[in-house]
Amino acid sequence: MEEKQPIINAVPAGIDGCGHYRIIQPALIMQQLGADLTLSPAAHFRTFGQNITWTQRMCNTSLLERMVKYKETTKQRFVVDFDDLLWLYEGESLPDYNLCRAKVNSEENTAGMAKYLDKLADKVTVSTDELKKSLLQFVDESKITVIPNMLAYKEWYHAQSPRPKKDIFYFAGSYTHYDNVNKKLGDFSQNLVHFLGNKKVVVKSLCPYFIKPEINYKASRLTTYANDFWKETRNVDFIIAPLANNVFNKCKSDLKYLESAAVGRVCLVSDFPGSPYSGAHPYQKIPEGTTTTGLKYIVERANEHYDEILKYQYEYLNKRWLDNNIGLYSEVLK
């Protein structure tokens, strides 16, 4: 009789250290060799007896409906987190250039949030004050806590490196923030394209196809891990984190500014009323509508004051280490 192949659920205690070497790596190789194996972040038995579910971006109507029924059955408390605007707020949601617009139906999400979110969420956490304001149409203010994005010190303490002074730029805008099919630049303004035309540029993820001939660019292979961001940016002088002036971007956080501070690079940021980068140093701000000549002046000035801006950025970051602020999460998850 043929021996039946076992079905394995591999559950490491953590993603680094012994968990990495004794469970994760052996499991990945066993998968490659044909084992019926799932590498899981949590075994099902660990959920027995839990009384809080902590989850993110619950805005899909059918999912919200099922989760409300699940909550009624299990009597659990739900803590729900949001870090982006995925519903209608002040008549807007995802801008027309955003790649995710097709799969995020704002009207449907808004209807689902209005019907189910207050029933589901005992507490809601958000990354910005503006995002909190947008949720007041669905949830009582007493349920909402603003916890800004932060960096874990153990992932970033090693990331500083001397700048190369090669006049190389790293474009850190999301690849979802422009529309290749309809040639909409979104956060990547035409003036910025003209300015970068004779510069060396590393572009995070994907470069808009229709401007490739206009800039001297190298594709980034960045993942979300801190180590990769450090590697990708160690040979650049400036990180550019552009945002168009719209409701969606006003709800976003200053995470790219924190990451730039951690790797020791000056971050050039968009400046408009309600910009998430309002707390940046004045010499690194790019006002809305800045011309190509204006961009040249801003970069020259930032070069002259590079160390001053770096110091400012790091002082800003020092208030936002996750290790020193973990109590914000502990308080919400009581």
Regions found by a protein language model. Name each.
Residues G14-D16, V80-A111, S174-Y175, F272:
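Acceptor-binding helix/loop patch of EC 2.4 sugar-transfer enzymes
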Residues K69, T73, R101-V124:
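Membrane-proximal helix-turn-helix segments that form the acceptor-binding/catalytic region
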Residues D122-L136, D140-Y157:
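Donor nucleotide-sugar binding/catalytic pocket of nucleotide-sugar-dependent glycosyltransferases
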Residues Y178-L185, A226-N227, K231-E232, D237-A262, ...:
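Nucleotide-sugar-dependent
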Residues T293, E300-K334:
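A charged, aromatic-enriched C-terminal amphipathic alpha-helix characteristic of glycosyltransferases
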